[in-house]
Regions:
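N-terminal amphipathic, basic helical "cap/leader" segment at the start of enzyme domains
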Residues: 1-93, 197-198
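Short glycine-enriched loops at secondary-structure junctions
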Residues: 99-103
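C-terminal helix-cap and adjacent tail motif
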Residues: 6-10, 14-16, 169-198
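Short, surface-exposed, charged loop/turn segments at secondary-structure junctions
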Residues: 66-67, 109-117, 187
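C-terminal edge-of-domain segments
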Residues: 90, 95, 175-177
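Short proline/glycine-enriched turn/loop segments at secondary-structure junctions
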Residues: 158-165, 182-186
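Small-aliphatic-rich amphipathic alpha-helix that forms the alpha element of a beta-alpha
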Residues: 35-36, 111-159
Length: 198
């Protein structure tokens, strides 16, 4: 089995994380930068935009998310939501994934035949970037999971970190030192998911 496939297997959703340093913050920045540069995008659009939050900035994101959810989740059932936010906040940092809609709209105008496809391709490209960063972090011992509290938090995130209006929030990836093993991952039979014709 190739090294790359082995590295893919290391990536799991890790929810129990702490602020303790596994790799330096600078190393996290290097991983994210390399991933942003080298993850493919349709028409080489390079529409991905990423923000990395550490320390108090990371904490602030999950405080914002908690208070945003508090306003819409019934008080008598808010407990589990609050616990989940606390778990994400317990991590060392968060990667925020965006897609620049100005780039996408420019491609739609330039290649009108594919107009309806560009938003879909943009999401697919973002998914690849998320996977690359997630897998790279996992292989350096960093636990992470992928969250989607957009569009509920979009406006407040934009205001707090002065995010350009054209950047559409796609996903949030809290990360940190794993403090518990992920549960066993069940697999459906590969025969039901893969067909080969020769």
């Amino acid at each position: 089995m190739s090294q790359f496939l082995d590295e893919i297997k290391v990536r799991r959703s890790v929810y129990a994380i702490s602020k303790e340093e596994v790799i330096s913050d600078q190393r996290v920045e290097e991983i994210v930068a390399e991933a942003v540069l080298h993850t493919p995008s349709s028409f080489n659009s390079q529409s991905a935009r990423v923000v990395v939050l550490f320390g108090e900035q990371h904490d602030k994101l999950w405080d914002i998310t908690k208070e945003t959810l508090r306003a819409i989740v019934p008080a008598d059932s808010f407990g589990p939501t609050e616990e989940k936010m606390a778990a994400f906040r317990s991590g060392r940092g968060t990667v925020l994934f965006f897609e620049d809609q100005e780039v996408i709209q420019g491609l739609q105008e330039q290649f009108a035949l594919y107009k309806d496809n560009f938003p879909v391709w943009s999401e697919q490209s973002s998914g690849m970037l998320q996977f690359v960063i997630w897998t790279a972090l996992a292989n350096e011992g960093v636990g992470a999971s992928l969250q989607h509290y957009n569009p509920l938090i979009d406006e407040k995130v934009q205001q707090e970190w002065n995010i350009p209006a054209s950047w559409k929030l796609i996903a949030q990836m809290p990360f940190g030192k794993p403090v518990a093993e992920p549960g066993e991952k069940p697999f459906n039979p590969i025969e039901s998911r893969l067909k080969v014709f020769k």
